[in-house]
Amino acid sequence: AGVGGTGVITIGQLLGMAAHIEGKGIVTQDAAGLAQKGGATWSHVLLANTQDEIRTTRVGMAGADLVIGCDPIVTGGKETVMRMREGRTHVALNGHGAPTAAFVKNTNWANPSDACAAEIGKSIGVDRLAAFNADAAASKLMGDSIYTNPMMLGFASQKGCIPLRRAALLRAIELNAVAVDNNKAAFEWGRRAAHDWPAVERLLAPAQVLQFRKR
């Protein structure tokens, strides 16, 4: 779940290709809100050991095992939350929310990302919510926030929420043939963030400037 034009659909495609590589059953279906680019976007991914086990094309109500939340506002919205269920759903969340159209109409608008994350935690249980600022990490470590979503994919993978091997996911990135090295690097940074976010977060801090005075 995320914002259109940022690679949400691509993440679904990568999961589909990785599942195909491993010989698993897979169905993906993409859904967008009123505005596909810049609007709320979802990619439904259904994964099973065999194709015959999949009998629908969308994740059902309270039926999600994992939500990769590339934007907290979209992830915390009704359309996404109603797919979650306490005790079942895990959420890997990018804590940075993109400004919405409300900002144009109200200059005092406050980004509700933290409130959305809190509501998600209430819906599934805080122990099933894992969040970090993937936008800041991608911008600092990769030089462009466009790598936020492959970083989120690596984050969810390292958390053990995706039943696909790392090798298959990396191979899917290679077959996608778009900025392969950077996307693979972003995936690996996401894995590091999942393993030790405080260590990665320290790399995002501005460099300290030392000034020396002449005597």
Task: Please report, for each region that a protein language model flagged, where it lies by residue.
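Active-site cofactor/cluster-binding pocket
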Residues: 1, 6-215
